[in-house]
């Protein structure tokens, strides 16, 4: 995951890590593990994040692939 691309989008929507974690139904510790590069988002979470921020397919690819 490219957090350098996702973070500005989150901030533009007024979200911090804990806000996004809650919005997608993930615990903060699990979110932090992924955020810090020790895991990856499952497809269901990628879909929820993409919907929340109205990400284009290109943005999804650049952030998560």
Model segments located where?
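Residues in the recognition helix of alpha-helical DNA-binding motifs
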Residues: 9, 23, 34, 63
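DNA major-groove recognition helix of helix-turn-helix/homeodomain DNA-binding modules
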Residues: 44-59
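Short amphipathic recognition helices of helix-turn-helix/homeodomain-type DNA-binding modules
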Residues: 59-65
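Short alpha-helical "recognition helix" segments of helix-turn-helix
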Residues: 19-22, 49
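Helix-turn-helix DNA-binding elements, focusing on the entry/boundary residues of the two helices
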Residues: 17, 28, 46
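A short, Lys/Arg-rich alpha-helix, primarily the initiator
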Residues: 1-15, 62
């Amino acid at each position: 995951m490219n957090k350098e691309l996702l973070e500005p989008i989150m901030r533009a929507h007024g979200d911090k890590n804990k806000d996004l974690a809650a919005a997608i139904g993930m615990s903060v510790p699990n979110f932090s593990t992924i955020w810090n590069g020790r895991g990856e988002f499952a497809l269901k979470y990628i879909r929820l994040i993409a919907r929340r921020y109205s990400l284009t397919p290109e943005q999804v690819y650049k952030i998560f692939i």
